[in-house]
Amino acid sequence: MVLGCLVATAAVLWGCRRVLTRIDVAATAEGPATLETIRATALRDLDAAADACRRGEPDRAVCRDISMALRRFAALACDSDLDYEGLDELSRHAEEDPRLDPVVAVVGRCYAVEFDPKGHGVDTDELLADAVRTVRSWT
C-alpha cells in the first residue's frame, strides 16, 4: 500500500514536470505569463487529457492528467506552489481563497480514481467538462 502511494506520488510529480515544461515553453513563445496565457495552456493540457480519454487511456491516467493540469493552473493563477501540494493542503488553501473550491472538487474526484486500487466508476467526460468550466470561469 505504501509502495503504491509512493509510486503514485512519483508519477504525479513526474507529470507536473512535464506540465511545467509546457507552460515555460508557452510563456516564452507568448511573452509574459498572464491569466489568459495560463488559461490557454491549461485548456490545451485538458484537451490533451480529452484526447487520451478518446484513445482509450485508462481512467486513472486521464484523471492524473486532469488533476495535474488543474493544480498547475491554480498554482500559476494564485502565484503559489499548489501543484506540489496534496488534496488536504489544497483544501486548506480553499478555505482562504474560495476560487479554489471547484479545483478541490475536481481534484478530489480525480484522486479517488488515481489512488484507489479498485478505481471508481467515473464519467471522465463530465470530469473534463468540470475542469474546463473551472479554468474558463476563473477570475
Where are these regions (language model features)?
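Membrane-proximal, non-transmembrane interaction modules
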Residues: 48-51, 57-139
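Hydrophobic, helix-length membrane anchors
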Residues: 1-53, 137-139
